[in-house]
Amino acid sequence: MLEKKQTKKIEEILTAIDLEQPAPSEEPMRQYYFMEKARRLVKAQSETVGRPLTFHVTTFGCQMNARDSEKLTGILEQIGYVEEEEENQADFVIYNTCTVRENANQKVYGHLGQLNRVKKKNPHMLIGLCGCMMQEPEVVEKLKKSYRFVDLIFGTHNIFKFAELVATRLESDRMVIDIWKDTDKIVEDLPSERKFSFKSGVNIMFG
């Protein structure tokens, strides 16, 4: 869980947001706007299925990916998802990918094949892919052609937009793809769930 002080601060920001107004252009307020929008959409879906929605994040690769996964987890918890230890039981599965080795890509494709079978039994399940593997154009093309059941694809440069991308997917019934080649934007001050209380990572580069 997020620290109480951080949770209280974020909650105050979210409850003050008026979704009847257009989304702000400035960050991080734009992402807080979409967090509140996603939170309401998740709540509605939870009420429909009669239980809290769950998520599972799998991290491949480096410490930077582990740090990014903490951010993804923090945002998911903030919008109403509950962490699930078993991947096949989760309503939202995210793979934070790495391309250090070629077999890393094949490992992700293998996992996706298994998830496709799970998703057929759980139609409202979402599958998201992010990380440096998604920065490869040929990978994205392969996913668009052969893995149409994937819901959300984004890269390393716009992970701060996660709440916005989730809200976009929850409002639609289509694959959402948002890949940036590079960026000069660094957006911090967003929810982050640290896996270990005694250590933390600091990004000194992105991408």
Positions of the model-derived regions?
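Proteins enriched for Cys/Gly/acidic motifs involved in redox and nucleic-acid/cofactor modification
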Residues: 2-207
